[in-house]
Amino acid sequence: MRQILIAVAIALTVSILLTPALIRLFTRQGFGHHTREDGPPTHHAKRGTPSMGGVAIIAGIWAGYLGTHLAGLAFDGEGISASGLLVLSLATVLGIVGFLDDLIKIRRSRNLGLNKTAKTIGQVAAAVLFGVLALGFRNANGLTPASADLSYVREIATVTLAPGLFVLFCVVVVSAWSNAVNFTDGLDGLAAGSMAMVTAAYVLITFWQYRNACVTAPGLGCYNVRDPLDLAIVAAATAGACIGFLWWNAAPAKIFMGDTGSLALGGIIAGISVTSRTEILAVVLGSLFVAEVSSVVLQILTFRTTGRRVFRMAPFHHHFELAGWAETTVIIRFWLLTAIACGLGVALFYGEWLAAIGA
C-alpha cells in the first residue's frame, strides 16, 4: 500500500507544479486551442487557451512510477516490471502521436491536425508493438504480461485467440480506448476527472489481484496476472497525475490536455485492461468513454444512411449543452455517472471473486 500512496503523491505533485509552467510557456509561444467552427457558441471563448497539457500528465505518471520504484529500494519493494513498462510505453507512444496532432493544429491555426490515415497508422503501430511484446517476457512462473484468452475479470479459457488474432484484438482495444477518451475531452475537466475515477478503480482491482495472486496465495479465486502490484502503481500514478492536472483544467480551464493527453490516457486504460485480464470489465468502468465514442459512431452511421442526426451534435456531451444544460452541469452529472459505473465495476469484480471462492 505504501507504493500506491507514494505513486499518487509524486504524480500529483509533479503534475500540479508542472502544469502552470506549461501554461506560461505555451502562452508565450502562442500554442493556443482552436475550437470547432460548428461547436457550441459558448466554446468560442475558449479559443486561445493553451493546449498540449497532456505533457504534464505523462510526465507526472512517469515520475510517479519511477519515483515509487526508487523509493521502493528503501523498503525492499518489487522492481520495475515488463507489464508496467509496456503500459507506460504504449501510453507514451500514443501521447507522441497526439502531440504531433496538437502541434499541427497550432501551426495551421485550425482544429485539424494529423490526417485520419496518419493518426490511425500511429495508433495501429503502437497497438501492434504492444500486442506482440505483451505475449513475450515470460517470467519464472510462466506468466506473460498479457494472455491470449479473452478476459472478463479473469481469463475465459474457452475463448483463446491465436497470436495473430490477439495482436488484431489489441489494435481494436487500443484504437477504441484512445479515441474514446479523445472524444470525451471536449468539456473542461471531463476527461481528466473521469480518468482519475477509472484509474482509482483499477488501483483497487489490481491491488486485490496482487493480494490474491496464484503465485503467492494459491487457492480458489486467485489471479494469474503477471505484475498486478506494478499495474496498481501505474494506475495510482495516473490517477494522481490526472487530479493534479484537473486543478488547472477544471472549468474555466486554464489549459487543455489536447490529443497529447487524451490519446495517452486511452492507452493507459487499454494497456491496464489487457495486462490485468479485465478487457470486458473495462467497458463497465469506462462506460462514459464508451458512450461518448458510440455517440459519434451512431451519429455518423445514422446520418449517412438516413440523412438525419440522432444528436444535435456529437460527441453527445455537446448535445446536452445545445439542449440548454450549462457546461458545468454536464461535467458534474457525467462525473457522477462515471463514479456509479466505477462502483458497479468494482462490485462486479469483487462479486466474481466471492462466487469463485464459494462465499
Swiss-Prot record:
Biological process annotations from GO: cell division; cell wall organization; peptidoglycan biosynthetic process; regulation of cell shape
Magnesium recorded as keyword: yes
CDD domains from the UniProt entry: GT_MraY
Protease as UniProt keyword: no
Protein topology in the membrane: Multi-pass membrane protein
Single GO molecular function: UDP-N-acetylmuramoyl-L-alanyl-D-glutamyl-meso-2,6-diaminopimelyl-D-alanyl-D-alanine:undecaprenyl-phosphate transferase activity
The enzyme's E.C. designation: 2.7.8.13
Co-factor(s): Mg(2+)
One family name in Pfam for this protein: Glycos_transf_4
Known pathway: Cell wall biogenesis; peptidoglycan biosynthesis
Localization terms from the record: Cell membrane
Cross-referenced PROSITE patterns: MRAY_1 (PS01347), MRAY_2 (PS01348)
NCBIfam families: mraY
HAMAP family in alphabetical order: MraY (MF_00038)
Family the UniProt entry places it in: Belongs to the glycosyltransferase 4 family. MraY subfamily.
Name listed for the protein in its UniProt record: Phospho-N-acetylmuramoyl-pentapeptide-transferase
Originating gene: mraY
